[in-house]
Amino acid sequence: VSLDGTEKVHDSIRGAGSYQKTRDTILDYISGPSRKGKPAWKDIWITMTINSLNYRTVTELAQEWKDKVNKIGFQFHTPFVKGDPLWLPFGETRNEVVDCIISLKKKYPNYIVNTEKQISLMKGNWGGNGTIPIQCPSWAILCFDHRGKVKQPCCIGSSDKKGLKPICEQCGLGCYSVLVAQGIKGF
């Protein structure tokens, strides 16, 4: 389940009432019967893509959902154009957010999905040059668009060769950075 911060911030990004609707759906699901012998809450993982609008809500969101869902994971917004206002630039503020997630991981080791090594990569460029993945193992996850065409250079890219490409040197994707943290790199 993707949440963009606490209710007020999430709703400012996704539309009024969307947070409460998502919350109600999750709480309704987890109040239901067990699934294959395990509690329903074990099925639910939350992911938050951190950006310039919601970075202040990381701790509050994690604490709000603790003991309600199984896991929460964090990644950072990846821009497609220079100057994207949602991108949280490398530097002091972003480093503080990463350090906050590391502290949460130490406090809730079985709840926070990110490893310290993986989230620490988010303090700087870990995988690309411009829109070209260099260290990134984008080859490890094959992604298709709605027509079955391969998306390039990665899961948020486009199958259109002339389409906008994500700026790899500002990548904040968790699905690839976790592979780099495990020692898997680009060709």
Located regions from the model:
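Radical SAM enzyme core and accessory elements
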Residues: R147-V150, G157-F187
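Radical SAM enzyme [4Fe-4S]-AdoMet core and its adjacent flexible, acidic
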Residues: S2-K151, S158-P166
